[in-house]
Amino acid sequence: MTERSPLRVGIGGPVGSGKTALTLNLCRALRNKYNMAVVTNDIYTKEDSNFLTRNEAMTPDRIVGVETGGCPHTAIREDASINLAAIDDLCEKFDGLELIIIESGGDNLAATFSPELSDLTLYVIDVAGGEKIPRKGGPGITKSDLLIINKTDLAPMVGANLDVMEQDAKRMRGEKPFLFSNMKTEDGLTQIIEFIEKQGLFKA
């Protein structure tokens, strides 16, 4: 019987939307449940992987930071080889790996993951970007497996109407799921985990 490949969950979204905070929360919630690892993408630094290591998301050997150079979307879409190589290394290092989170570098709304890199794609936008963000569309908003509208606590400060964002998200995504979250308070985290487990067939 062939060993099952790990589920690869891609987390994308613009700079500052809360991707790394989501990755950290997922690691803390799932690291004792699944054999898992993380690959982060940054243009010229390893800031996100260093942040996860400093905050003890997992043991440092399970967190790999890749420096993409140039446009971050190239490393998750047009030429995913640097990420695929990092995944291969992790699979060799940790036998029976079940889950790998791939966090993209911050990019625009047009960035998406290559199907060869990610089995399941979560796309994170934030309320601070304004209530118009969902209606702007783009592959991340319309085609991701789960759209996460983060930082709901900032809505009153930026004058964003969550009801408008909800209606626009429904219109842009059709039947595809989305949810509101606040990664600072872990609001919405349980639903995100349930989605990953159900779609990744960890749970019947």
UniProtKB/Swiss-Prot annotation:
TM stretches of this protein: none
Keywords, sorted A to Z: Chaperone, Cytoplasm, GTP-binding, Nickel insertion, Nucleotide-binding
Localization: Cytoplasm
One GO-annotated biological process of the protein: urea catabolic process
Positions bound to GTP: G13, P14, V15, G16, S17, G18, K19, T20
Gene Ontology MF terms: GTP binding; GTPase activity; nickel cation binding
One of the Pfam families matching this protein, by short name: cobW
Gene Ontology CC terms: cytoplasm
Keyword Nucleus: no
Family annotation (PANTHER family): UREASE ACCESSORY PROTEIN G
Family per record: Belongs to the SIMIBI class G3E GTPase family. UreG subfamily.
Function: Facilitates the functional incorporation of the urease nickel metallocenter. This process requires GTP hydrolysis, probably effectuated by UreG.
HAMAP family, alphabetized: UreG (MF_01389)
Assembly and interaction partners: Homodimer. UreD, UreF and UreG form a complex that acts as a GTP-hydrolysis-dependent molecular chaperone, activating the urease apoprotein by helping to assemble the nickel containing metallocenter of UreC. The UreE protein probably delivers the nickel.
Protein's UniProt name: Urease accessory protein UreG
